[in-house]
Amino acid sequence: MKAELIAVGTEILTGQIVNTNAQFLSEKMAELGIDVYFQTAVGDNEERLLSVITTASQRSDLVILCGGLGPTKDDLTKQTLAKYLRKDLVYDEQACQKLDDFFAKRKPSSRTPNNERQAQVIEGSIPLPNKTGLAVGGFITVDGISYVVLPGPPSELKPMVNEELVPLLSKQYSTLYSKVLRFFGIGESQLVTVLSDFIENQTDPTIAPYAKTGEVTLRLSTKTENQALADKKLGQLEAQLLSRKTLEGQPLADVFYGYGEDNSLARETFELLVKYDKTITAAESLTAGLFQSTLASFPGASQVFNGGFVTYSMEEKAKMLGLPLEELKSHGVVSAYTAEGMAEQARLLTGADIGVSLTGVAGPDMLEEQPAGTVFIGLATQNKVESIKVLISGRSRLDVRYIATLHAFNMVRKTLLKLENLL
């Protein structure tokens, strides 16, 4: 199946907003085994939009339009598609009720006739409810071509795609089953080299590597009759892949940490903390609270995290954590001594089971004769205090801080697995 994405909105063409919807939708279509062949952006102009829809209909099986579902006159996506398909616009009862409920809590003057446009769908289409906004989406197939209309704001589009469109497309088109393997501690180039024979000779299942900031994923996909057969085929391939060794001789399974497109090292670590009923604290220098804010982003974080420290300067490390200032000056803040001391003192001061610390050089300049990207991460438990040195070279200041937190989460994750004799 060939799909085409059409982004509607003059603000995209003028550079006022970035079309992140295209990336999101392309990834979702890939998960479903639907190939996106074309992406187009068009302004809020009926004539040009009609031209784009006509072209897309001649070369694609699935046409997805994003944006232009709002209440203003330049929101004309549904109106233009209806004109092209020679269909009427009708009101969706559920969307109308949502409009009524929304404006019932507001001044009567805030509702205008234009708002009613948001509850319209093309006659004969399947409505796609909007759980985070007012503009209803829709799905319709005419003459063998399927059309989808989606709202433009990502906060509305993503839930609609995940909860409404993906299940709908899965039932109608997809026979592709996928499993995403996540790796940390190995680069894409090395992973591809280690698995080159699998990748070069792949048929079914297929293997697709993706490099992300600080980590790599492998998407394993197969076309088969049902989930059970897919699980068997993908499981066999996974076992073969993870039995390989890195170029340093380390088992590939050691740098594999989890499954899923939306998973992360932070989530894996958080879930292990909850599972094993452990609490954690952190003392951060170069990351300035990034580790703690990431941890706190998960619902239920208070089960495992009560608080921590951000000690950016040497003086604050001494003042807040009780580390000897003269020793800090002697060893430097970019050192194993400081990292281990920060982790242990944070743990003792809060009574947490685990203390973690991050100190180093975010860049771009050197610090204490250490190059940018030099990071020490400390970890303290009741029985042990340790640290690792990480070099994150050739990265921006933002990336150094982010990747440093990934290393910290991975260190905590491995510690938890060791404590439970699972690693």
Curated annotation (Swiss-Prot):
- Cite the InterPro entries for this sequence: CinA (IPR050101), CinA-like_C (IPR036653), CinA_C (IPR008136), CinA_KH (IPR041424), Competence-induced_CinA (IPR008135), MoaB/Mog-like_dom_sf (IPR036425), MoaB/Mog_dom (IPR001453)
Q: Which domain of life is it from?
A: Bacteria
Protein name in the entry: Putative competence-damage inducible protein
What is stated as this protein's family in its record? Belongs to the CinA family.
Among Pfam families, the record links this protein to: CinA, CinA_KH, MoCF_biosynth
Question: SMART domains per the record?
Answer: MoCF_biosynth
* Taxonomic lineage from the root: Bacteria, Bacillati, Bacillota, Bacilli, Lactobacillales
